[in-house]
A protein has these predicted regions:
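Hydrophobic alpha-helical transmembrane segments in multi-pass membrane proteins
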Residues: 39-51, 128, 201-217, 301
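Transmembrane helical segments that form the transport core of multi-pass membrane transport proteins
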Residues: 191-264
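Membrane-core helix-loop-helix motifs of multi-pass transport proteins
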Residues: 108-164, 278-303
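Intrinsically disordered, low-complexity non-transmembrane regions of multi-pass membrane transporters
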Residues: 167-196
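Alpha-helical membrane segments and immediately flanking helix-loop junctions
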Residues: 74-138, 233-251, 257-279
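Structural signal for alpha-helical transmembrane segments and their membrane-water exit/capping regions
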Residues: 6-25, 48-58, 163-165, 213-224, ...
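Juxtamembrane boundary at the C-terminal end of a transmembrane helix
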Residues: 305-312
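Membrane helical hairpin/interfacial module
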Residues: 42-99
């Protein structure tokens, strides 16, 4: 009951704030919409479409069969889970989460394995790390390989820790025998379903980006000067805008690099909500997922700290 009352008061307060600050709302919404339209829609929509199409056809079988001899013993996963690992590390938020959920819905992997995959297979894309982060934001293209390496390495290292939560008795080998061959659709039907699913997902992602862009516009007007607000909380709302904020602050290059690495590994609150949207059909623990992303962010920042101390 208290939570419901707090939600009501929060929404009423937000509504009044929007009424008295229409310029801030318009600016934030426009920034979020343009960011979605120019950078997210043309990049992410094709990946959402093609991954959905591959899951609905037999296309993923070749990927799983090719990569499972390496990934299966290394990560402790079943053969059918190899595709999610590829999506999670190559396609960016929240394609990895959607592939985990879709494979679980299709009966290709168990719910426990899907949740385990989510703990380390839903990451920022390599193009974002090497392009937007190292070149456009940090203006240090020589750090592109390092920016790419640390989040991936941290996620893989943390997977060995998270595995203990999901693999008490290695339950991931059973689902392969339970897969229903009727789940593969004719290409035209699979394409229709994939387009509809991709449109639904990309629209929800855009909605969250607009909401959090408006929120960060209001938060940026607050004149708090403490470390937690300026360097952690405010940039952690939305990743792209947060990195831009950090790069505009008067920070040492070492501290800036450490912070952007941590934020990229965490993904931001906006990415958390996008992920929650993609896994809504699953009974997975979202607080545990948040804890896993925070742990991965700390490991990434530790790698960045060691690198700056040794080579900075």
């Amino acid at each position: 009951m208290k939570t419901k009352k707090l939600s009501v008061f929060f929404l009423i307060g937000l509504f009044l704030l929007m009424l008295f600050s229409p310029e801030t709302v318009a600016t934030g919404a426009a920034n979020g919409l343009l960011l979605w339209y120019r950078q997210v829609l043309p990049v992410l929509f094709p990946f959402l479409l093609i991954t959905g199409l591959m899951i609905r056809t037999e296309s993923i079988s070749l990927i799983n069969h090719t990569l499972s001899p390496i990934l299966k013993p290394f990560l402790g996963i079943s053969e059918n889970a190899s595709f999610s690992v590829v999506c999670g590390f190559l396609c960016g938020f929240p394609v990895g989460a959607k592939s985990c959920s879709d494979l679980t819905d299709k009966g290709k992997i168990s719910s426990a394995e899907g949740e385990y995959l989510l703990s380390f297979c839903n990451n920022v894309s390599p193009a974002f790390l090497t392009g937007y982060l190292s070149v456009q934001s940090l203006n240090q293209p020589e750090l592109a390989q390092i920016c790419l390496l640390f989040p991936i390495l941290a996620a893989l290292c943390c997977s060995f820790l998270f595995r203990r939560w999901y693999l008490p008795r290695n339950p991931f080998a059973v689902v392969e025998e339970q897969a229903d061959p009727r789940q593969f659709l004719p290409f035209s039907e699979a394409l229709d379903e994939s387009i509809l699913s991709a449109c639904d997902s990309i629209t929800k992602i855009g909605g969250y980006m607009i909401v959090f862009s408006v929120l960060i516009s209001f938060m940026a007007k607050l004149s708090f000067q403490n470390f937690f607000w300026k360097l952690l909380l405010l940039p952690g709302v939305e990743l792209t805008g947060g990195i831009r904020m950090l790069c505009q602050l008067d920070l040492t290059s070492e501290l800036r690099f450490l912070l952007v690495m941590a934020h990229c590994s965490f993904g931001g609150v906006c990415a958390l909500f996008q992920t929650k949207c993609m896994i809504r059909s699953q009974n997975w623990s979202f607080p545990r997922y948040i804890a896993e992303k925070l742990i991965t962010a700390m490991v990434t920042s530790l790698f960045a700290f060691c690198y700056m101390k040794l080579f900075g």
